[in-house]
Amino acid sequence: MFLLYEYDIFWTFLIISILIPILAFLISGILAPIRKGPEKLSSYESGIEPMGDAWLQFQIRYYMFALVFVVFDVETVFLYPWAMSFDVLGVSVFIEALIFVLILIVGSVYAWRKGALEWS
Protein backbone atom coordinates (compact mmCIF):
# COMPACT_ATOMS: atom_id res chain seq x y z
CA MET A 1 0.00 0.00 0.00
CA PHE A 2 1.33 3.39 -0.97
CA LEU A 3 1.18 6.20 1.53
CA LEU A 4 0.23 8.88 -0.97
CA TYR A 5 -2.49 10.26 1.26
CA GLU A 6 0.25 11.91 3.31
CA TYR A 7 0.86 14.26 0.38
CA ASP A 8 -2.74 15.48 0.15
CA ILE A 9 -1.99 18.58 2.22
CA PHE A 10 1.07 19.33 0.09
CA TRP A 11 -0.86 19.10 -3.19
CA THR A 12 -3.69 21.17 -1.75
CA PHE A 13 -1.34 23.97 -0.71
CA LEU A 14 0.51 23.77 -4.03
CA ILE A 15 -2.68 24.13 -6.04
CA ILE A 16 -3.93 26.97 -3.84
CA SER A 17 -0.58 28.78 -4.04
CA ILE A 18 -0.69 28.55 -7.84
CA LEU A 19 -4.34 29.60 -8.15
CA ILE A 20 -4.21 32.69 -5.90
CA PRO A 21 -1.69 34.66 -8.04
CA ILE A 22 -3.41 33.58 -11.26
CA LEU A 23 -6.77 34.76 -9.94
CA ALA A 24 -5.25 38.02 -8.68
CA PHE A 25 -3.78 38.79 -12.12
CA LEU A 26 -6.98 37.85 -13.90
CA ILE A 27 -9.17 39.98 -11.64
CA SER A 28 -6.83 42.98 -11.86
CA GLY A 29 -6.67 42.61 -15.64
CA ILE A 30 -10.45 42.60 -15.88
CA LEU A 31 -11.18 45.40 -13.39
CA ALA A 32 -8.24 47.76 -14.02
CA PRO A 33 -8.79 50.64 -16.44
CA ILE A 34 -6.64 50.56 -19.55
CA ARG A 35 -5.32 54.02 -20.41
CA LYS A 36 -2.40 54.41 -22.76
CA GLY A 37 -0.57 57.64 -23.27
CA PRO A 38 2.87 59.22 -23.36
CA GLU A 39 3.09 59.38 -19.57
CA LYS A 40 2.47 55.64 -19.25
CA LEU A 41 5.24 54.89 -21.75
CA SER A 42 7.90 57.07 -20.09
CA SER A 43 10.30 55.65 -17.52
CA TYR A 44 9.73 56.58 -13.89
CA GLU A 45 12.63 57.95 -11.86
CA SER A 46 11.20 58.75 -8.41
CA GLY A 47 9.06 61.64 -9.62
CA ILE A 48 11.92 63.38 -11.42
CA GLU A 49 11.92 63.96 -15.16
CA PRO A 50 14.04 61.25 -16.78
CA MET A 51 17.40 62.46 -18.02
CA GLY A 52 18.97 60.55 -20.88
CA ASP A 53 18.42 56.91 -21.66
CA ALA A 54 16.84 54.77 -18.96
CA TRP A 55 18.77 51.65 -19.97
CA LEU A 56 22.21 51.14 -18.41
CA GLN A 57 24.62 48.29 -18.81
CA PHE A 58 25.85 46.95 -15.48
CA GLN A 59 29.48 46.08 -15.03
CA ILE A 60 30.41 42.40 -15.06
CA ARG A 61 31.64 42.65 -11.46
CA TYR A 62 28.06 42.79 -10.21
CA TYR A 63 27.27 39.55 -12.02
CA MET A 64 30.30 37.82 -10.54
CA PHE A 65 29.26 38.73 -7.00
CA ALA A 66 25.70 37.63 -7.75
CA LEU A 67 26.97 34.32 -9.09
CA VAL A 68 29.08 33.68 -5.98
CA PHE A 69 26.09 34.57 -3.80
CA VAL A 70 23.86 32.12 -5.68
CA VAL A 71 26.43 29.33 -5.34
CA PHE A 72 26.65 29.73 -1.58
CA ASP A 73 22.90 30.18 -1.29
CA VAL A 74 22.36 26.85 -3.06
CA GLU A 75 24.96 25.32 -0.76
CA THR A 76 22.90 26.44 2.22
CA VAL A 77 19.75 24.95 0.70
CA PHE A 78 21.49 21.60 0.29
CA LEU A 79 23.16 21.57 3.70
CA TYR A 80 20.14 22.61 5.79
CA PRO A 81 18.17 19.35 5.43
CA TRP A 82 21.33 17.39 6.11
CA ALA A 83 21.99 19.37 9.28
CA MET A 84 18.42 18.84 10.49
CA SER A 85 18.72 15.04 10.16
CA PHE A 86 22.38 14.67 11.07
CA ASP A 87 21.79 12.26 13.97
CA VAL A 88 19.79 9.85 11.78
CA LEU A 89 21.98 9.74 8.68
CA GLY A 90 25.29 8.65 10.14
CA VAL A 91 28.97 9.08 9.36
CA SER A 92 28.89 8.25 5.63
CA VAL A 93 26.55 11.14 4.88
CA PHE A 94 28.74 13.40 7.03
CA ILE A 95 31.72 12.50 4.85
CA GLU A 96 29.69 13.20 1.69
CA ALA A 97 28.64 16.62 3.03
CA LEU A 98 32.25 17.34 3.98
CA ILE A 99 33.36 16.52 0.43
CA PHE A 100 30.61 18.80 -0.91
CA VAL A 101 31.79 21.69 1.27
CA LEU A 102 35.43 21.06 0.34
CA ILE A 103 34.57 21.21 -3.38
CA LEU A 104 32.88 24.57 -2.81
CA ILE A 105 35.85 25.84 -0.82
CA VAL A 106 38.23 24.80 -3.61
CA GLY A 107 36.00 26.57 -6.13
CA SER A 108 35.89 29.77 -4.10
CA VAL A 109 39.68 29.74 -3.60
CA TYR A 110 40.09 29.27 -7.36
CA ALA A 111 37.75 32.20 -8.07
CA TRP A 112 39.61 34.32 -5.52
CA ARG A 113 43.01 33.52 -7.03
CA LYS A 114 41.77 34.25 -10.55
CA GLY A 115 40.65 37.70 -9.35
CA ALA A 116 36.93 37.15 -9.85
CA LEU A 117 36.15 38.54 -6.40
CA GLU A 118 38.23 41.71 -6.66
CA TRP A 119 36.40 44.96 -7.23
CA SER A 120 39.10 47.12 -8.80
Swiss-Prot record:
Keywords: Chloroplast, Membrane, NAD, NADP, Plastid, Plastoquinone, Quinone, Thylakoid, Translocase, Transmembrane, Transmembrane helix, Transport. The keyword Heme does not apply. Its EC number is 7.1.1.-. One of its GO terms (cellular component) is NADH dehydrogenase complex. It is an enzyme of class 7 (translocase). Its main location: plastid. It is a multi-pass membrane protein. It catalyses: a plastoquinone + NADH + (n+1) H(+)(in) = a plastoquinol + NAD(+) + n H(+)(out); a plastoquinone + NADPH + (n+1) H(+)(in) = a plastoquinol + NADP(+) + n H(+)(out). NDH is composed of at least 16 different subunits, 5 of which are encoded in the nucleus. HAMAP family: NDH1_NuoA. NDH shuttles electrons from NAD(P)H:plastoquinone, via FMN and iron-sulfur (Fe-S) centers, to quinones in the photosynthetic chain and possibly in a chloroplast respiratory chain. The immediate electron acceptor for the enzyme in this species is believed to be plastoquinone. Couples the redox reaction to proton translocation, and thus conserves the redox energy in a proton gradient. This is NAD(P)H-quinone oxidoreductase subunit 3, chloroplastic. It comes from Cicer arietinum (Chickpea).
